[in-house]
Every structure is written in C-alpha cells, then in structure tokens.
Amino acid sequence: LEDGAMCVALSSGTSAIMYSLINIMSQGDNFISANQLYGGTYTMFDNILPEYGINAKKVDITNLEAVEESIDEKTRAIFCETITNPGLVVADISALSDIAHSKGIPLIVDATFTTSAIQKSFDYGADIVVYSLTKWMSGHGRVIAGAVIEKGGFEWGNGNFPLFDKPDTSYGGMRWGHDLGDLSNVAYSLRLRTVPLRNLGANMSPDTAFEVMSGLETLALRME
C-alpha cells in the first residue's frame, strides 16, 4: 500500500517506533523529534530511550530552521507524525526530507493517522514509515499490531551509522551497510528483522496478521 521495498510486521505500533530507532542508534546518539506526538510515543522518548542513552531532541517540527539547527554529528534521524495526535499539526514531509537528506540521515514518519489511503509518505521523501496497525489500518479494534516499512535505496553505509559499518558479531561479522550486495537496497529492513526483531521478539502473531489483512480490505472505504 505504501509502495515500499520491504515491510516488517510487529506486535504493536510502540514496538514499531522503538525498533525503527534502535535499528540505527545506540548509546550516545540522538534524533530530532516533533515536540507534539502521540502520548505513548512522548513517554517512550522522554522516559524509556534516555535510559539507554538515546535522546530525542524535541523541536517545533513546523520551524524548519530550528529543525536543521538541532542536528549535530550524533543525530541519526528526524522523526515526525504525518498529522500529530491529538494536536493535528501537519508535517511538511518534503521539507523535512530535504533537511534530513542534506545531512545524510533518514526521515522516519509515523503515518498511523493518515494511512496510505490518504497519503503515501514515500512520495514526499520519507525513508521509513511506521504504523500502529491497531487503529485505522485494522479498523475493528480487535488487535494490537504495528509495522515498519522501508522505501528502499537509502545509503546506510554513508558513515553516519556505526551500527551499519562495524561487523555484527551476532551475525557472522556482517556489515549491514556494506556486505549485502544486491540486497543493500533493503539493508535497514534486513537488519531490523535480524537484530531487533530476532533478539527482542516483538513479532506479530498469525491471528493478528489475519485480522489486519481483513481490515485492510475495507481501508479505502473507511478512510473516505
């Protein structure tokens, strides 16, 4: 639905956001975050990630100058929501993408509120899209689920992501940003599937997958 290159389905939107960040960040790193976010995301960024040495630098996402000025050598991504919940602030994804790409970092967009039925964030320059599938995508309120979708083509071996440069001792010395050959287009998703998901285990259950697929059948109609 997003016209992405690869998707990793997870057990919740919260795990999707967490995995999307820790896949490219470690202790001492930071990312730029919108200062208006869904409450659960705000709590994660304020209270959980700092315990692991990862810090969210919150800025007014509509102030593009402030966004750019907040980026430093330890910044690994820009994170925003398509439309904030509940503040209804609309992110200028194209402009944020331009800033991110000028610094060699990705734009991660939480598209839960709009879904791909209203807006395809990749068309505006997003590199990673995350979802809580619990809400509009599923639509029936019967499951909790999430997803991380990669557009494909971002250069993860550009020197800005140490986790993609150093050999992964848990996976035969693989350097995710350099050793994948024809699969380098989806290096981010392959690492997310193999490292955070494999080792932390927030996988989607088969029953949940069935419910989500059933919900997707009526997504476009419901989003009208």
Model-derived segments and their meaning:
Residues M6-E224:
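Conserved PLP-enzyme active-site core in the AAT-like
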